[in-house]
UniProtKB/Swiss-Prot annotation:
One function term, GO molecular function aspect: serine-type peptidase activity
Active site: S757, D834, H867
Biased composition (Basic and acidic residues): 1-10
Keyword terms of this UniProt record: Aminopeptidase, Glycoprotein, Hydrolase, Membrane, Protease, Serine protease, Signal-anchor, Transmembrane, Transmembrane helix, Vacuole
Protein name according to UniProt: Probable dipeptidyl-aminopeptidase B
Residue ranges crossing the lipid bilayer per the database entry: 93-113
Functional description taken from the UniProt entry: Type IV dipeptidyl-peptidase which removes N-terminal dipeptides sequentially from polypeptides having unsubstituted N-termini provided that the penultimate residue is proline.
Length: 919
């Protein structure tokens, strides 16, 4: 399960531009801390009891008629002749009375409308005055237009980022990068030397790999959607007609372009229209391994024929590509194929899904299967059967196999002390030298790690390291693919091969160096009450430097550091004197890097040159000038970063206050969360998202707190949630909300919480645990409601199997419908074709609500939408609904419809008001 990419960053190949000036964002950002020890709840003020009916006097003329009853009235016009002669005057009196009654009724109706809503302020208007709370920093003085939801959804607030493709030169030259998107004079696809861009004579000239963005094959125009140059830069692999499969996987038609002749041919000349799932260059640039119909093939460029590596792949057997659950929860990618460094071997997964149960996903509008229905069957939904293992059900059986390129032979290596087939998850494969490969595996519940060393030449293997993480701190092993091989170099003090891994150390995740490869003992490179992130980023083998990103300054920040390979002389490379959030991508030889500053001010990117302890800025390639202009023109919320202490744990929090915040007023508060294990929502990246829109345009306060279970606050706080998802996380949200409810500028009668995916689960779990005491409203999108319904690999990592932890699954399930009924109202939305968090979750919840006679909720489904809810304008609609629903909640509308009472029509009231009108 991954957080929804609601405000995803753009990352694209763009022509690199020269340096431009950049100004800081005008968002105000301050820091403070708050503890439960200083919490003094204020006087509780009950919400006005309004049910939407008009208070009427106990008078017969206003009572409702029983069914079939007719009121008796005297005739208005007498039958006598005397009465007839005075008809004109009587008519005038009649119409005067009618107009007076009608006017009185309209006045009463208007008073009802205004009076019934007088206690429900809209946005930040009509807020009650209270004393200011100045403990949390300054208020916003930014001016300008409010942020619009349309801007957020259209990505207008997304920073512009460049993804540079660093490549090694044919002779292992450093500082070369691939650029895509130039004009015909520059060439569409080029390899540039960063030194040449700065006018350095030592730089290589730019080399054009593709002159035009379109190539022709047998008279057919091929428009590639992505490109991959060969390591020797003499060929380019192209993909066209790309189609998405799952989150990371896709298929397409592949082509090989010759750089010198600018001509292309199909990857498989015998099947040019075949759809390929994966294609990877050989390190020797002389071959491409690819997957089609779940089988592996090898195309040597010296021949037009292809070599069949596997033959039995199909519906239940996958070779070289992951199945759904491995793609989503283990690899986070579309490839489980790895070339050895010398191009002599290929390692790949064989995934057997035969025993995995299927789950049907229905599509009512589209037909993603691509199959045309038979005549007469057009009105039936397209059904996609997914092999989806749920907790306790059979998992796919994954084996590591190898292919000897020269011998054209597939083989496996048996290893003693390996996990059983039904208890093995392979999380990483890393080639070393001389045909050796490191394999990291865990048991099914992901709390025992085993590292194996396999020798493909001798076809032997052994266990070299084992860690009982559950016994260490009750935690789990998070899958990652960041382990780095360190080759031996006696001249630089490395007599043996080794590798750098991330391991738990004194309660935090840190870098450890293992050498030789079969050593179980590590040299710790980092330590302290902070953590490394997806490390190492790069290793300078000549100078013995390890570069990495870490949270040493604060959990919400990311800075770039370097440390010697012996663990000494750790230093930051980025400016740590002020808050910052950086990312980095190093060149092949680590002499250069793309440094990306993501916040809190306006993001920028620069090419830097590394010189050991120092960095030199070579070229500013992006300063997001357009974003700077928008920041100056719009009123952004004030962001206040704080620490809160709950049960002795220090948690990270950000409060977004509306522009022109007035501490003398009372504001509604929306809590936003994700909260999944190891995740992080509170960080220092520049972000203008839905929460920013809520604060800027709607005038509400938005609070986000990363509770226990989230990442980068230490393993003690993270691992406590294992086996009981939702309990501590919800407790932390409620405890923090009580702190905010006690603040002088918060309207404690108007507090809501919302989230998507795991955040949707957390919204419902918080409402359930809170039972209306703190939060009155909630909005849950695509929520898990019972962890038995989610996939096995993710769930069992944090919950064990249902067989081992039945009570934990019972406790984490949304079951207390009476508690949910105590909130004023909540909203649930779900994509009907969600392949990740199945619609089953919401449907079972609705059944429980029905059985408990609970009606205080709204429900919305989106046909054919998956977990991201995008199909047919659904993404816009889901956020429109969130916005409107929230406004109605804080306006008090859901109180008005809580207990509906029939209301008389205007005509019926008029008739009883003037009984003489009707004989």
């Amino acid at each position: 399960m991954r957080p929804s990419d609601d405000h995803g960053e753009t990352s694209e190949f763009l022509p690199i531009t020269r340096s431009r000036s950049v100004s800081a964002a005008s968002q105000t950002s301050t820091d403070s801390s708050l503890s439960t020890e200083s919490l003094f709840p204020g006087e509780q003020k009950p919400f006005p009891n309004v049910n939407g009916t008009m208070a009427l006097a106990d008078d017969d003329q206003y009572r409702d008629l029983e069914d079939g009853e007719v009121e008796q009235t005297e005739p208005f016009l007498a039958s006598s002749k005397k009465a007839a002669t005075g008809g004109g005057r009587a008519r005038r009196i009649f119409w005067i009375l009618v107009l007076l009654c009608l006017g009185g009724w309209l006045l009463a109706f208007a008073l009802f409308l205004t009076g019934g809503r007088a206690n429900y302020q809209t946005a930040s208007d009509a807020l009650q005055a209270h004393g200011a709370d100045s403990a949390l920093g300054s208020t916003s003085t930014s001016s300008g237009k409010p942020v619009t939801l349309q801007q957020v959804l259209a990505g207008q607030w997304n920073p512009r980022y460049h993804a540079i493709g660093w490549v090694a030169g044919p002779n292992n030259e450093d500082g070369l990068l691939v650029e895509k998107g130039g004009d015909e004079k520059q060439g569409y696809l080029r390899v540039d030397d960063i030194r040449s861009r700065k006018g350095n004579d030592t730089g290589r000239e730019s080399r054009v790999l593709m002159w035009k963005p379109i190539v022709h094959v047998d008279g057919k125009a091929i428009v590639p959607s992505n490109v991959w140059p060969s390591p020797d830069l003499k060929k380019v692999l192209l993909i066209s007609e790309q189609q998405k499969n799952w989150r990371h996987s896709f298929t397409g038609k592949y082509w090989v372009l010759d750089v010198d002749s600018q001509t292309a041919q199909p990857l498989d000349p015998s099947a040019p229209d075949g759809r390929v799932q994966l294609a990877l260059w050989s390190p020797a640039s002389d071959a491409v391994v690819f997957v089609r119909d779940n089988n592996l093939y090898l195309r040597r460029l010296s021949s037009d024929s292809v070599v069949v590596i596997t033959k039995d792949g199909g519906e239940n057997l996958f070779y070289g590509v992951p199945d759904w659950v491995y793609e989503e929860e283990v690899i986070s990618g579309n490839s489980v194929t790895w070339w050895s460094n010398d191009a002599k071997y290929i390692a790949f997964f064989r995934t057997n899904e035969t025993s995995v149960p299927e789950f049907p996903v229905q599509y009512y509008i589209s037909r993603p299967s691509g199959k045309k229905p038979l005549p007469g069957l057009e009105n039936y939904p397209d059904v996609r059967e997914i092999k989806y293992p749920k907790p306790g059900a059979p998992n796919p059986v994954v084996d590591l196999q190898f292919y000897d390129v020269d011998k054209n032979e597939v083989f496996s290596v048996e290893v003693a002390d390996d996990f059983a087939d039904d208890d093995r998850i392979i999380i990483e494969v890393l080639w070393a030298s001389e045909g050796k490969v490191l394999v990291r595996s865990t048991n099914r519940e992901s709390d025992i790690l085993k590292v194996y060393l396999i020798d493909t030449k001798s076809r032997t293997g052994k266990l070299v390291r084992s860690e009982d993480v559950a016994g260490l701190d009750g935690g789990w092993v998070e899958p990652s693919q960041s382990t780095r091989f360190i080759p031996a170099d006696p001249n630089n003090g490395r007599p043996h091969d080794g590798y750098i891994d991330t391991v738990p150390y004194n309660g935090y995740d840190h870098l450890a160096y293992f050498s030789p490869l079969d050593s179980p003992n590590a040299l710790m490179l980092t330590s302290g009450e902070w953590e490394v992130v997806d490390a190492p980023a790069a290793v300078d083998l000549q100078r013995g430097l390890v570069y990495f990103v870490g949270t040493r300054e604060a959990p919400t920040q990311r800075h770039v550091y370097r440390v010697q390979l012996d663990g000494s002389n750790l230093k930051p490379l980025t400016d740590t004197s002020k808050p910052g959030y950086y990312d980095v991508s190093f060149s092949h030889g680590t002499g250069y890097a793309l440094l990306t500053y993501k916040g809190p001010s306006i993001p920028w990117q620069a090419i830097i040159k590394t010189q050991g302890d120092e960095i030199t800025y070579e070229d500013r390639i992006e300063d997001n000038a357009q974003l700077t202009k928008m920041v100056e023109a719009y009123a952004l919320p004030t962001e206040i970063y704080q620490n809160v202490t709950v049960d002795g744990y220090t948690l990270q929090l950000v409060e977004r206050r509306p522009p022109h915040f007035n501490p003398a007023k009372k504001y509604p508060v929306l809590f936003y969360l994700y909260g999944g294990p190891g995740s992080q929502t509170v960080d220092r990246k520049f972000t203008v998202d839905f929460q920013s829109y809520v604060a800027s345009s709607l005038g509400y306060i938005v609070v986000t707190v990363d509770g226990r279970g989230t990442g980068f606050i230490g393993r003690k706080a993270r691992c406590i949630v294992r086996g009981n998802l939702g309990f501590y996380e919800a407790h932390d949200q409620i405890a923090t909300a009580k702190m905010w409810a006690a603040k002088s500028y918060v309207d404690e009668t108007r507090m809501a919480i919302w989230g998507w995916s795991f955040g949707g689960f957390m919204t419902l779990k918080t409402l359930e645990q809170d039972a209306g005491q703190t939060f009155q409203y909630g909005m849950a999108v695509a929520p898990v409601t019972d962890w038995r319904f989610y996939d096995s690999i993710y769930t069992e990592r944090y919950m064990h199997t249902p067989q081992h932890n039945p009570s934990g699954y019972d406790n984490s399930t949304i079951t207390d419908m009476a508690a949910l009924s105590e909130s004023v109202r909540f909203l649930v939305m779900h994509g009907a074709s969600d392949d990740n968090v199945h619609l089953q979750n919401t449907l079972v919840l609705i059944d429980k609500l029905d059985l408990s006679n609970v009606e205080n909720y709204d429900l919305q489904f989106y046909p054919d939408s998956d977990h991201s809810i995008y199909f047919h304008n659904a993404h816009t609609m889901v956020y429109d609904r969130l916005s409107d629903w929230l406004v109605n909640a804080f306006n008090g509308e859901w109180h008005l419809i809580a207990k509906p009472v029939p209301d008389e029509s205007m005509w019926e009231r008029m008739k009883r008001s003037l009984p003489l009108l009707y004989p």
